[in-house]
Regions:
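Acidic/histidine-rich catalytic cores of soluble enzymes
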Residues: 43, 133-200
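Secondary-structure boundary/capping motif
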Residues: 23, 54, 127, 152-153
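Active-site groove signature of glycoside hydrolases
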Residues: 105-128, 143-146, 170
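N-terminal pre-domain/capping segments
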Residues: 1-115, 133-136, 169, 198-199
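Active-site beta-loop-alpha junctions enriched in small/polar residues
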Residues: 13-19, 46-48, 81-84, 122, ...
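Short beta->alpha linker loops
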Residues: 60, 122-126, 155
């Protein structure tokens, strides 16, 4: 067997299997097995989607998780978080509650052996700043996902970059999504939007 001419490692976000998981044609274990079979050794888990009883993470799930990692030759790399700011019908979460939610998700990542937490794009910069010291303490990186229609000169991303540069926190960064490189929507997406009543 020849040695590859690069050191790029392949991983997969289990978000890629969301339809199969939702339709129950694949279990979490199946998703990990398939990832391993195609040579994607790094695994990103979406806890809200794939951990039964989330935000509670049972000892049984953790044991199964590490058993699957060993069995299929995969490694936990990242978890994803969604900041549920509208948890209550009459108000948004306060800054303190949002940071506490991040702490919970950081703890879940640590428990599952992941060193990266991918934060959803709508995460306010002040929440990332507030959670950074805890992430540093736990040895976790908080990376803001960047995908279309956002780009690296978008005002929202610039606000995040200001926090990253000002604090100098090694826990904060950006995670590019391939959608960053989208120049236009695929024709089928535009046509469907028009059929559904969108105005050009």
């Amino acid at each position: 067997m020849t040695t590859p001419s690069h050191a790029i490692k392949r991983g997969v976000s289990l978000y890629s299997f969301q339809e199969e998981y939702f339709l129950r044609t694949l279990s979490v274990e199946d998703c990990i097995r398939i990832a391993g079979e195609i040579g994607a050794r790094g695994i990103e888990l979406i806890p809200e989607q794939m951990i039964p009883g989330f935000p509670h993470v049972s000892d049984e799930f953790v044991a199964d998780w590490f058993s699957w990692m060993e069995q299929y030759g995969t490694t936990p790399v990242a978890t994803d978080l969604f900041l549920d700011t509208k948890r209550y019908p009459d108000r948004w979460l306060t800054l303190e509650e949002q940071v506490a939610s991040f702490h919970r998700d950081i703890d879940i990542a640590v428990r599952l052996g992941a060193t990266v937490v991918r934060a959803i794009i709508n995460t306010p910069p002040e929440v990332m700043e507030g959670a950074a010291p805890y992430a540093e303490e736990k040895g976790v990186r908080l990376l803001l996902e960047v995908h279309a229609p956002f780009h690296y000169e978008h005002p929202w991303i610039l606000q995040h970059l200001e926090v990253m540069h000002r604090t100098g926190s090694p826990a904060l960064g950006l995670m590019p999504d391939m959608g960053t490189f989208v120049e236009r929507f695929p024709r089928v997406v535009s046509e469907r939007a028009l059929r559904n009543g969108a105005k050009p």
